């Protein structure tokens, strides 16, 4: 497997892999600095949309991935999301992805957030998966933490195999195929 360059990412985006797409790096908006997004040397920095689900413990339930209670989250829409101390929030990317059959995509958090104790987690985007990426932001600090909508939050790395997979995510009817918006756990 080899990592794909900015040139490859631009060509793949022209074929519909990433929508909307930014061909370069955006570092400013409205005259001020932002957390960067867009194409980098060997990756693509995605933006966080303005839809959030903030984890709350008001119902004092047990977190069970097989029977997840939607009431464990408070829905929020806005330019800035405040994550409570030692808690987390779900969000989604602005970008919609269509991953080629020969590609596996790995997501890593941006250092701007990591250096503040905010960790971004996303599982790999498998071959022929498509949808908005659901992002998990963990606030590992004892203080409230801000996430900025419309700005960079994570970087996607594209790895292309020297052999096309026998069965893709689409072929096996993956449960998150075509997801839109913030998607909760499914079994």
UniProtKB/Swiss-Prot annotation:
Pathway of action: Pyrimidine metabolism; dUMP biosynthesis; dUMP from dCTP (dUTP route): step 1/2
Gene Ontology MF terms: dCTP deaminase activity; nucleotide binding
InterPro entries found in the cross-reference section: dCTP_deaminase, dUTPase-like_sf, dUTPase_trimeric
Keyword Hydrolase in annotation: yes
Residue positions of the active site: 136
The EC number(s) this enzyme carries: 3.5.4.13
Record bears the keyword Glycosyltransferase: no
GO terms (BP aspect): dUMP biosynthetic process; dUTP biosynthetic process; nucleobase-containing small molecule interconversion
The entry's keywords: Hydrolase, Nucleotide metabolism, Nucleotide-binding
Positions contributing to dCTP binding: 110-115, 134-136, 155, 169, 179
Pfam families (UniProt xref): DCD (PF22769)
Catalytic activity: dCTP + H2O + H(+) = dUTP + NH4(+)
Subunit-structure text: Homotrimer.
Function recorded in the entry: Catalyzes the deamination of dCTP to dUTP.
Family, as annotated: Belongs to the dCTP deaminase family.
HAMAP family linked: dCTP_deaminase
Official protein name in the record: dCTP deaminase
Gene name in the database record: dcd
């Amino acid at each position: 497997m080899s990592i794909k360059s900015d040139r490859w990412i631009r060509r793949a985006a022209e074929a519909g892999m990433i929508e909307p797409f930014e061909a370069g790096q955006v570092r400013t908006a409205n005259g001020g600095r932002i957390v960067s997004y867009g194409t980098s040397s060997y990756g693509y920095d995605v933006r966080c949309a303005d839809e959030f689900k903030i984890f709350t413990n008001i119902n004092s339930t047990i977190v069970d991935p097989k029977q997840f209670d939607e009431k464990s989250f408070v829905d929020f829409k806005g330019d800035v999301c405040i994550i409570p101390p030692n808690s987390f929030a779900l969000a989604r990317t602005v970008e919609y992805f269509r991953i080629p059959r020969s590609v596996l995509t790995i997501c890593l958090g941006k250092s701007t957030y990591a250096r503040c104790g905010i960790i971004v987690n996303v599982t790999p985007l498998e071959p022929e998966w498509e949808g908005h990426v659901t992002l998990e932001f963990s606030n590992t600090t004892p203080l409230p933490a801000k996430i900025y909508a419309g700005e960079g939050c994570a970087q996607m790395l594209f790895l292309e195999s020297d052999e096309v997979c026998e069965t893709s995510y689409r072929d096996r009817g993956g449960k998150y195929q075509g997801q839109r918006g913030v998607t909760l756990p499914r079994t």
